[in-house]
Swiss-Prot record:
<comment type="similarity">
    <text>Belongs to the bacterial ribosomal protein bL12 family.</text>
</comment>
<dbReference type="GO" id="GO:0022625">
    <property type="term" value="C:cytosolic large ribosomal subunit"/>
</dbReference>
<dbReference type="GO" id="GO:0006412">
    <property type="term" value="P:translation"/>
</dbReference>
<dbReference type="GO" id="GO:0003735">
    <property type="term" value="F:structural constituent of ribosome"/>
</dbReference>
<dbReference type="InterPro" id="IPR014719">
    <property type="entry name" value="Ribosomal_bL12_C/ClpS-like"/>
</dbReference>
<dbReference type="Pfam" id="PF16320">
    <property type="entry name" value="Ribosomal_L12_N"/>
</dbReference>
<dbReference type="InterPro" id="IPR036235">
    <property type="entry name" value="Ribosomal_bL12_oligo_N_sf"/>
</dbReference>
<keyword id="KW-0689">Ribosomal protein</keyword>
<keyword id="KW-0687">Ribonucleoprotein</keyword>
<dbReference type="Pfam" id="PF00542">
    <property type="entry name" value="Ribosomal_L12"/>
</dbReference>
<dbReference type="InterPro" id="IPR000206">
    <property type="entry name" value="Ribosomal_bL12"/>
</dbReference>
<protein>
    <recommendedName>
        <fullName>Large ribosomal subunit protein bL12</fullName>
    </recommendedName>
</protein>
<dbReference type="GO" id="GO:0003729">
    <property type="term" value="F:mRNA binding"/>
</dbReference>
<dbReference type="InterPro" id="IPR013823">
    <property type="entry name" value="Ribosomal_bL12_C"/>
</dbReference>
<dbReference type="InterPro" id="IPR008932">
    <property type="entry name" value="Ribosomal_bL12_oligo"/>
</dbReference>
<comment type="subunit">
    <text>Homodimer. Part of the ribosomal stalk of the 50S ribosomal subunit. Forms a multimeric L10(L12)X complex, where L10 forms an elongated spine to which 2 to 4 L12 dimers bind in a sequential fashion. Binds GTP-bound translation factors.</text>
</comment>
<comment type="function">
    <text>Forms part of the ribosomal stalk which helps the ribosome interact with GTP-bound translation factors. Is thus essential for accurate translation.</text>
</comment>
Length: 126
């Protein structure tokens, strides 16, 4: 029985972030490809064309560089910000440096940074 694209997309949309990461890794192994190389190849032409036009950055990425001495509070903050489950939030925190959120506004990035720093984490906004 063949599975339709819509069924595959529906299944993936119901997965957690960690499950999607594991799926991507399994696909990379099975098909001997790298998803990162494809993303760089697609993003490279856009970056060259948009560099002159993009004078002011409008989308930011929040990166946690370390969780400091209070890991429990940082995990709680990550769960509140991202909506991740306990295990996924713990894995994200322990995997520092790690991206917390991408493509957020300047105000939202500042708010996330403040919340994580109050919890004890070290955070960068890129």
């Amino acid at each position: 029985m063949a599975v339709s694209k819509n069924e595959i997309l529906e299944t993936i949309s119901n997965m957690t972030v960690m499950e999607v990461v594991e799926l991507i890794e399994a696909m990379e192994e099975k098909f001997n490809v790298s998803a990162a190389a494809a993303a760089v190849a697609v993003a490279a032409p856009a970056a060259g064309a948009g560099a002159a036009a993009a004078e002011e950055q409008t989308e930011f990425t929040v990166v946690m560089t370390s969780f400091g001495s209070n890991k429990v509070n940082v995990i709680k903050a990550i769960r509140g910000i991202t909506g991740l489950g306990l295990k996924e939030a713990k894995d994200l925190v322990e995997g520092a440096p790690s991206t917390v959120k991408e493509g957020v506004s300047k105000d939202e990035a500042a708010s996330i940074k403040k919340e994580l720093e109050e919890a004890g984490a070290t955070v960068e906004v890129k």
